[in-house]
Amino acid sequence: MRDYDEAIAFLGEWGPFQRLIFFLLSASIIPNGFNGMSVVFLAGTPEHRCRVPDAANLSSAWRNNSVPLRLRDGREVLHSCRRYRLATIANFSALGLEPGRDVDLGQLEQESCLDGWEFSQDVYWSTVVTEWNLVCEDNWKVPLTTSLFFVGVLLGSFVSGQLSDRFGRKNVLFATMAVQTGFSFLQIFSISWEMFTVLFLIVGMGQISNYVVAFILGTEILGKSVRIIFSTLGVCTFFAVGYMLLPLFAYFIRDWRMLLLALTVPGVLCVPLWWFIPESPRWLISQRRFREAEDIIQKAAKMNNIAVPAVIFDSVEELNPLKQQKAFILDLFRTWNIAIMTIMSLLLWMLTSVGYFALSLDTPNLHGDAYLNCFLSALIEIPAYITAWLLLRTLPRRYIIAAVLFWGGGVLLFIQLVPVDYYFLSIGLVMLGKFGITSAFSMLYVFTAELYPTMVRNMAVGVTSMASRVGSIIAPYFVYLGAYNRMLPYIVMGSLTVLIGILTLFFPESLGMTLPETLEQMQKVKWFRSGKKTRDSMETEENPKVLITAF
């Protein structure tokens, strides 16, 4: 009896066909990188102050002193949300009184920005914040906008796998590309914050669905040796490339509507990929469409300049997927040991996700150039992914994950010790923290898959990755803490990251251990460990079914 991989082994692992699929599917991830982080510039909040109408009868001295000062980071700046009561200072101006000399400004009555705001255009010309005045009493709408995008990501995670199982990988891949690109384009015509946010939620659904289906399609078409590299370096690195393109677009296009228009262009350029990316032969076989699957394999063999056997699938009945025991979510809590491990995994995924997305979204709040900071935040991800891949090949999982979490959280805690004038050092520490947390995040898929038995492995990875979506939903509010104290987000994120690093040490080690098949074969969390564990040689290849559901 031959399985699918044996039936197509004659194709080889890394011919022209595999290289083309690797590159095209990875390239299809690029729009996900800038769409996923576009809110950084679409909803950027520029410096602002209360507007004083030109019609107000004020002397130049009173006009220049119409907005009170407040302390921010140890220095006095103009208040963003208050002004002196206009009727009062207009009366003083008419009487010829001078501010500060004849009138004590500290005793004057203040009022809110009844005539709107004046926004600085030094960094942004136009954002959704300036469009709909999402500041002061309405500043809560900015993190909510981002959170609702990630709610869409959560919803898309639920449906993307089911849709691709029902309608095919290729069809759903391009349909979700169209959703992501099309609804991003529709956002340009938003007439209200509510309309923009609802459309943004739908963009989030398309964004993650495209990512997941491209991942599934690649892991099903590519061979075992290439599959692992594709699932770690391929999709992650190209996501980071898209992320790096975002600040480049935003630097030259500082109007939010024009920026959105520019960001839809790469999605349109993906349309020709339809004629180069095939359907998954594995999926076609599962649908008993054997002739179509053979046609794809024959074309691949021709591209690789390899002779095709007379019969590729000699016993189609034997190639049907093996039936697996049905699992339920409650199986992840069936015993005390697996329940503790599941709860620990949920916390690890959620809080690592909070750190990753909060640091990514916080780049405009760093000192210096917002566009350069965003680019550096994206650039640091590439060495982080490469480092994670290299570490996973030889070193114990729980120790390396804990180490990079300690690194990431520790440097974030050091930021509060840096003098305000040394902002370049603060930025460097933030990037080092992002490096550590990104490395840890990319390792969690493999680690979780190795801990759980076959019967619940896919479900475990799926449920824990859902926890990471919850983390991304609450991450914008960690950034929002900076409105109260500039250091507060780093103190909270750093502390939580160090704590989950400690938590990671209580997981069992999975390197060198045979993948468990049943709940009884699962290793115990550290405080339940007793007796001597048997160490078996680990299979050199990952379980394909694990990799398919990893992201």
Curated annotation (Swiss-Prot):
GO terms for molecular function: acetylcholine transmembrane transporter activity; amino acid transmembrane transporter activity; amino-acid betaine transmembrane transporter activity; ATP binding; carnitine transmembrane transporter activity; PDZ domain binding; symporter activity. Allosterically activated by intracellular ATP. Residues 1-20, 163-171, 219-232, 279-337, 393-399, 448-460, 508-551 are cytoplasmic. GO terms for cellular component: apical plasma membrane; basal plasma membrane; mitochondrial membrane. The keyword Transmembrane applies. It is found in: Apical cell membrane; Basal cell membrane; Mitochondrion membrane. The chain crosses the membrane at residues 21-41, 142-162, 172-192, 198-218, 233-253, 258-278, 338-358, 372-392, 400-420, 427-447, 461-481, 487-507. One of its GO terms (biological process) is amino acid import across plasma membrane. It is a multi-pass membrane protein. ATP binds at G218, T219, E220, I221, L222, G223, K224, S225. Keywords: ATP-binding, Cell membrane, Glycoprotein, Ion transport, Membrane, Mitochondrion, Nucleotide-binding, Sodium, Sodium transport, Symport, Transmembrane, Transmembrane helix, Transport. Glycans are attached at N57, N64, N91. It catalyses: ergothioneine(out) + Na(+)(out) = ergothioneine(in) + Na(+)(in); acetylcholine(in) = acetylcholine(out); (R)-carnitine(out) + Na(+)(out) = (R)-carnitine(in) + Na(+)(in); glycine betaine(out) + Na(+)(out) = glycine betaine(in) + Na(+)(in). Transporter that mediates the transport of endogenous and microbial zwitterions and organic cations. Functions as a Na(+)-dependent and pH-dependent high affinity microbial symporter of potent food-derived antioxidant ergothioeine. Transports one sodium ion with one ergothioeine molecule. Involved in the absorption of ergothioneine from the luminal/apical side of the small intestine and renal tubular cells, and into non-parenchymal liver cells, thereby contributing to maintain steady-state ergothioneine level in the body. Belongs to the major facilitator (TC 2.A.1) superfamily. Organic cation transporter (TC 2.A.1.19) family. This is Solute carrier family 22 member 4. It comes from Papio anubis.
